[in-house]
């Protein structure tokens, strides 16, 4: 290839002057916000130490990842996984260090499910004796595990999973089978080629009687040569939209025999003589799923925040067209339409952050009660984690798509980084429960709570608003009212309560008219999902308001003011999007909606001076985010050109296809001229 015509040494270039100007205009200390997002100054310091270690190692270079085949991507991910385990052992990393290292590496390892689901399942679903046996092996990576629940024919409907585990009293064993093509396990990450073991969800059968879904640990592959064991047929399911470095797999079980002790017996047990005993609520088996749904809210924040950072930096550097025809081309960040794409996305990221914080804190605080099988608490957490997983991943997906389009044509390039994030993060709307189904599960719980509230019960937790008298909440008459997030929050409560009551009334009316419950439910599905979404948005707004309020006594006034503006924008943006529900429930009037929209636009102009600083606080290192458009120095065009020169097709000036195909056509045509 010919020598570069333009400078490609971005390390020698100064920071783009437009970005320098943006950073100088910030009204708060960026590092202060970074500390909050990380969890404190010490955690930021630790993260940067891990970044320095990880991103300086050639194994974690992202330079040529786009050009790897699926098999090469997987091998690279395995290499990264092994390297992180080696460092964990060498440097005695804590679980928090491991989680942080995964985030630094954008979780581009092959066996994250080992840490995120296999180990938590061993911690939550086993007896003490089983934990002593299996947990050290998993923590030391002497075995590699996955969590095999979803089947080819059933994902959402767990009750109808078809894998069976039949107790053989003569041998004191369980015999596991996937009897039909739809019964095979399908989708678990790290199942195809990586894992040596799996926790399998199967229908327990004893003497012809079914005892529901139970968890079993099975060995998939030899610990000597990694070959599948007898009774195991396992493989990779093939290319996906994204995450092709993960070996999502299928698993067929044919008369696989395992010891009775391999049933995880923390919640239920089977004795030597075949007696089944339910020790805790059967819903406790789903505690691992709840945990992963909490994790998904964290991942949604990371994906959306990183995407917003990239789009914001690029929009500050990119100049195109004019606002004033007599002036120079303007930064596209100065266009109101661009701000309306970017600022609500960033505000949503902060709302998801505060929501995830509260959800994680509550889950950790209540974990012991959940493991003990507290039925009321399990029902509340199932509802809340379902709703928050769904709404956070929905918002993330919508905004990342908008952010990618905000980059114009360059956003279509994989080098933008956003295309990769968009494709990889799409899995979050279906993994651990398809969102529409999760909203329905939340709605079912909420209608029970509505009935309790209407009968006079005083509710607590996330449904406390159902017990409040919200009929006389003040209206949004002025721009100042619109900036009063506590007032706006009350209007969200009023809207959500009335929408839920309306949905419940529709179902109840159909039941009273003789419609069977399942038909009444199906007839009103869309309304019920809409009601659950209203509740979910309310929770996001409430967590956002509470999160900013909590900072008022500890953070600087400038930062609190900046986050307050984002909090206002988030609440008003989704009020505007859901204007129909707010008007339908008499929460706002059409004229008040005009005030809301005018305040939205004013907030865009107020956030504008802090936009880059708010995005910079996300603090993703250039070596980690895989984007030529979102680097800290803002040298977009030089990085794009340098990256294009690295395209393997450009290694030679004449592609082999010319000699194979084009030459004959061209020469044949020119001979006729």
Segments from the language model and where they lie:
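Flavin-dependent oxidoreductase catalytic core characteristic
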Residues: 1-673
